[in-house]
Amino acid sequence: MSDRTEQVATSDIPRPTQNLRTRVVSYFPGLAVAVLIAISAQFLSEHYGAPATLMALLLGMSLNFLSESGARTVPGIHFASRAVLRFGVALLGARVSLEVLSDLGVSLLCLVTTALACTILFAIIVGKFAGMDWRLSLLTGGAVAICGASAAVALNAVLPPRQNSDRDLALTIVAITLLSTSAMVLYPVLASHLQFDAKESGVFIGGTIHDVAQVVGAGFAMSEETGQIATLVKIVRVSLLAPTIIAVLIMVTVLGAGAGQKPQKLGQVIPGFVLGFAFLAALKSMGFLPAAAGDVANDLSRWLLLIALGAVGLKTSVKEFASIRPSHVTLALLATAFLAAFIVVGLLWYRG
């Protein structure tokens, strides 16, 4: 085979040995498309109230043809869906502070923490009975239990690669976003029906709704006190993203990611973005991260994740969704219902 033939047969993704200028030129078209999708998604979110993450995915999926083999945009799309995503996840650490845990109280903190762990375990068990890949079940359970799209992106980045992982991530985010939007409308009504007081309503809203913005919307729609408590509880759930990622990472590296994969030493395989996440979380928790720097990191993380999700959408074909089994969406719905029921029962028991 000639050098020319070999060159044509290689991947659209640039080799690591290529110089920086060649990489930048190669990445630019696809990366520019992903950035434009993120800007458009944010515009739709600000002017029409649509969830930005969902808009980024749907806009990307509508332009899926740009990720077809041979297109000039392929290298940049791949870069955005991997490298940009991981950098955005690392910056999520600036949102995590262990200080908020002490403000909630031991009993309610135990309730929220136990609900998170049990929801993930519930999703894995139900997924196993439904014949689903355990990684997809864990991804779905983690997204429901912790913080929606951000948790899904972070967990997907540390889970072992699998076929159609980008498609599964996209579908998970779509399902979680729609469920969270429904919960924002229905859960305040349910809290009132159960005669929860402001504190109980705040714990219920913050402990069950997936997306941060929707927690804030539902909480403050009930009352100022409920909104503040709901936001605090949601921050606690976000804070638990770090130990969850570490636990998953230990599981897939020390115990082995699956059949045929040998266990590895944890120190050999911890991704740099996980270390960055942990480092920023530690700085935030110890008070060493200035508020201004934290705000910049939060904003940058949000934009990077929007860009990455736009790229994930670009790599996801609408036709592929036809091959999705209903069990995936059903699992997200069941996990959401389980989390809500767990928190309700816990609050009723806590009440006395």
Curated annotation (Swiss-Prot):
Pfam families: Cons_hypoth698. Its main location: membrane. Coiled coil: none annotated. It is a multi-pass membrane protein. It is found in: Cell membrane. Belongs to the UPF0324 family. This is UPF0324 membrane protein RA0957.
